[in-house]
Design a protein with these regions (language model features):
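Membrane-interface transmembrane helices that cradle and orient dolichyl/undecaprenyl
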Residues: 86-91, 127-142, 250-254, 300
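Specific aromatic-rich, kink-prone transmembrane helix
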Residues: 78-80, 119-136, 142-150, 292-295
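Membrane-interface alpha helices of multi-pass inner-membrane proteins
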Residues: 37, 109, 142-158, 192-194, ...
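Transmembrane-lumen/periplasm boundary regions of multi-pass, lipid-linked membrane glycan transferases
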Residues: 152, 163-254, 272
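Short helix- or helix-capping micro-motifs
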Residues: 8, 94-105, 150, 154
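Short acidic/glycine- and proline-prone juxtamembrane loop motifs at membrane-interface regions
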Residues: 106-120
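Membrane-proximal, lumen/periplasm-facing interface regions of secretory-pathway glyco-
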Residues: 278, 305-351, 360-375, 379-391, ...
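Transmembrane-helix motifs of polytopic, lipid-linked glycan transferases
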Residues: 68-89, 126, 130
Length: 438
């Protein structure tokens, strides 16, 4: 295990350095804003990502090191995976699994970006580890820890609920019901409920708004577009990588680790099914990847095949870092240049107070880079966390709005007799408006 520990520590060090160098994306800045308004949960997502950012507040003087607590937790998931696999696989296969994770575009480079995916991957793997303990030890502590891991996973991202059908399908199809110590199952249910209570309470207090939003966001569209399914399938083949996918499909795991089959393929099949109802974002099945990579690592040829995987995604990762860190390349894509545009915008608009933005992305980024509160103007874009804040409507008789040219204004401004004048244009397509009222 010493070699694996060294690999884990070196890769952690590299991640922490890169995480500090790369500026926060707009979504990350949004979660960072949440961390300055801590709640039991939030409209868009459960609260874990905000809690992790709050732990990093003291690191903000060190570039973008506010990410470090979340990045560390995401990397700790690899160590949990090592502890799970060391009972079942030899060192070489575990090393192969680590490399598959480290060079994965979402589990590797993607783990530098703080989203709800980081904590949910940790608690998904921790739940797998606890399940392995439950099946082996069958004691109260194991069952209680299993429930706690699932409950905390629910505080990270709602996708953790897919763990339950994966487990039930495994117990049913593999005829493993007799391995369950039923007298301790209530301990799992109780600790699971206790540790996900913040999310349950918040939704109860807010008419289950977050649950409704996620269901509508992921499952409801009026008409089917075949491109949803095609893009989902192609994206997953590319992200997992054809050779890795082939190895995972062909391997026949030994009985003690057959549960990996269900935790690998059921989430992928679930989101394949939802692709017939709505567009599926490429990262949604991320919970399946650790088990897919575990299956692939068991294939006798994967130790040799992994060089193609590492070469392909290693080159892409290197190119992404060059594009992010070398200013001349940032203009290749608007999403790449966005954090840098917002960083410049924060400097250009610093003298305009109170300042509002026209989207949660803009407002959050300006707030993060300026360290001065910048709220999104209420109802100027789709409903989000900012619309729940009293500051979303200006209290005085004067304020400033920075927005993208061409974006509209909310109706209530004219109803409240606000008038405005354009006072500044800022590249690439921003405009600052001054609003006043009698």
């Amino acid at each position: 295990l010493k070699d694996l520990k060294r690999l884990w520590l070196i890769s952690l060090f590299v991640k922490l350095i890169l995480a500090a160098l790369i500026p926060l994306s707009a979504d990350e800045a949004y979660y960072w804003v949440w961390s300055h308004r801590l709640q039991l949960s939030y409209f868009d997502h459960p609260p874990m990502v905000a809690w992790l950012f709050s732990l990093g507040h003291f690191l903000e003087p060190f570039m973008n090191a506010v990410r470090w607590p979340a990045v560390f937790l995401g990397h700790a998931a690899i160590w949990v995976g090592i502890k799970l696999l060391q009972k079942h696989l030899d060192i070489e296969k575990i090393r192969t699994w680590i490399y598959l994770v480290l060079f994965s575009p979402l589990l590797g480079f993607g783990s530098l970006i703080v989203t709800p995916d980081l904590p949910v991957i940790f608690f998904w793997l921790l739940s797998l580890y606890c399940l392995d303990q439950v099946l082996e030890k069958k004691d109260l502590n194991s069952y209680a820890a299993f429930g706690a891991a699932l409950g905390l996973g629910f505080c990270a991202k709602y996708h953790i609920v897919l763990f339950v059908p994966c487990l039930l399908l495994y117990l049913f199809l593999e005829k493993k019901w007799n391995t369950v110590n039923w007298k301790w199952v209530p301990a799992t249910l109780i600790t699971g409920l206790l540790f996900c209570l913040p999310v349950i309470l918040w939704n109860y207090q807010n008419d289950f708004a977050s649950f409704k939003f996620q269901l509508e966001h992921g499952l409801e569209r009026p008409h089917y577009d075949p491109e949803w399914t095609i893009s989902y399938v192609l994206a997953q083949i590319l992200i997992i990588f054809p050779v890795v996918l082939w190895a995972a499909l062909k391997v026949k795991p030994a009985n003690p680790v057959r549960f990996m089959i269900y935790f690998a393929w059921l989430p992928l099949l679930f989101f394949l099914g939802t692709s017939f109802k709505a567009l599926v974002e490429a990262n949604w099945p991320i919970i399946a990847y650790p088990a897919v990579f575990m299956l692939a690592a068991m294939h006798p040829r994967m130790a040799q095949w992994k060089k193609y995987y590492i070469g392909f995604f290693g080159a892409i990762t290197a190119a992404a870092l060059v594009i992010l860190l070398v200013p001349q390349f940032r203009t290749l894509n608007p999403k790449i240049s966005e954090p840098f545009d917002f960083q410049n915008l924060a400097q250009e608009t610093a003298k305009y107070q109170p300042l509002y933005g026209d989207s949660y992305q803009m407002s959050s980024s300006l707030w993060y880079f300026s360290k001065t509160p910048v709220f999104k103007l209420k109802d100027i874009s789709r409903f989000d966390f900012f619309d729940t804040l009293p500051e979303a409507k200006p209290a005085g008789n004067k304020f400033y709005l920075v927005k993208h040219e061409g974006n509209g204004l909310p109706q209530w401004l004219s109803e409240q007799q606000w008038t405005y004048q354009e006072i500044k244009k800022i590249a690439p397509d921003f405009v600052v408006l001054e609003f006043t009222r009698p």
